[in-house]
Amino acid sequence: MNILSIETSCDETSVAITQDGKKVLSNIVFSQIKDHQMFGGVVPEIASRKHVELITLILEKAFQKACLTPQEIDLVAVTQGPGLVGSLLVGINAANVFAYTYQKPLLGINHLLGHLYAAQIEHQIKPNALILLVSGGHTELLHFKNHDQIEVLGTTLDDALGEVYDKIAKALHLGYPGGPLIDQLAQTGKDTYHLVRPYLKNNNFNFSFSGLKSHLVNLLLKQNIQDLNIPNICASFQASVIDVLLTKTKRVLKKLPIQQLIVTGGVASNSALRKKMKETFLDLEVIFPSVQYCTDQAAMIGIAAFYQKNITPPSYKYDLTALPNLTF
């Protein structure tokens, strides 16, 4: 089965063609980072306009790379949410038009589900897996029982981890996006600031990083940037958030018979997180998608669609709309 998938939930314009829920025939991604850097973050209006400019070209490139024609597509899948409503609508409108033109079935996919299935591209997700999803907009612990039964164990109560990375980087005048910059600087620093480990004095699996963000931003505002050891601040920040992720994950493992741990989402490309997770959970099969599949891209949407098509039947109505606040 050949699946055409489209992802435009934020600031990446991506189109992919995948085969049988495993093989990636093409996965074209255009990142808008340079368009948003001067603003220190994603500007929704700019993002949606850029998607409009690029979507047709990216579609053409995906077919060229896959060496297929539109007639050879069996299913069209598109990110329906969550995300920026203007950005989502560009991808959804493109999917509606393509599917209608070639009379192909159409399926809307949850972006978060896509991140989960990013691991399926190079690995095999097993029943009763624990999923730690860490991205720009979400921090979630999920129990993957099987393809039609995914339970949310813990979620973000305020700021998602990727968002906090960007705000700390902005306070340090490092630039955007903040995640890779902080990760790189932290490699030469030490945990000398011993920052708070937020929201651990409880028995649940939820996350809250707003207190840590406020504490660190206030610390930076009270001191001259030139007097600070930036690598040590980055290392201390990473040590704090990784400790929280490890502690919450351990808490789940004490209650559920998990044999496989999958860490996915944009923050899963962080080198320190990848290293600590693999060092800590030696008795588990710990899986990270390749860095190219951690960030937003359409291949993960196509893989998710292959497994979800029998759970949520595709439609020939071609009237999908955006669901910007979609959850699991």
Swiss-Prot record:
Annotated signal sequence is: none
Q: For this protein, what does the record note about how its cofactor is bound?
A: Binds 1 Fe(2+) ion per subunit.
Q: Which InterPro entries match?
A: ATPase_NBD, Gcp-like_dom, KAE1/TsaD, TsaD
- Gene Ontology molecular function: any one: N(6)-L-threonylcarbamoyladenine synthase activity
- Keyword Cytoplasm among UniProt keywords: yes
Q: Per UniProt, which keywords does this protein have? A: Acyltransferase, Cytoplasm, Iron, Metal-binding, Transferase, tRNA processing
Annotated binding of Fe cation, by residue: 111, 115, 296
Cellular component (GO) terms are: cytoplasm
Read off the Pfam families from this record: TsaD
Q: List residues binding substrate.
A: 133-137, 166, 179, 183, 270
Q: Which residues form a coiled coil?
A: none
Q: Provide the reaction this enzyme catalyses.
A: L-threonylcarbamoyladenylate + adenosine(37) in tRNA = N(6)-L-threonylcarbamoyladenosine(37) in tRNA + AMP + H(+)
Keyword tRNA processing: yes or no? yes
Q: What class of enzyme is it?
A: transferase
**Which SUPFAM superfamilies does the entry link to?**
Actin-like ATPase domain
Give its localization. Cytoplasm
Cofactor(s) listed in the protein's UniProt record: Fe(2+)
Q: Which Gene3D superfamilies match?
A: 3.30.420.40
Q: Which GO terms describe its biological process?
A: tRNA threonylcarbamoyladenosine modification
Q: What is its main location?
A: cytoplasm
EC numbers listed for it are 2.3.1.234
Q: Which family does it belong to?
A: Belongs to the KAE1 / TsaD family.
Which NCBIfam families has this protein been placed in?
gcp_kae1 (TIGR00329), T6A_TsaD_YgjD (TIGR03723)
The family database entries (PANTHER family) matched by this protein are listed as:
TRNA N6-ADENOSINE THREONYLCARBAMOYLTRANSFERASE, TRNA N6-ADENOSINE THREONYLCARBAMOYLTRANSFERASE, MITOCHONDRIAL
Q: What does this protein do?
A: Required for the formation of a threonylcarbamoyl group on adenosine at position 37 (t(6)A37) in tRNAs that read codons beginning with adenine. Is involved in the transfer of the threonylcarbamoyl moiety of threonylcarbamoyl-AMP (TC-AMP) to the N6 group of A37, together with TsaE and TsaB. TsaD likely plays a direct catalytic role in this reaction.
Q: Which protein are we looking at?
A: tRNA N6-adenosine threonylcarbamoyltransferase
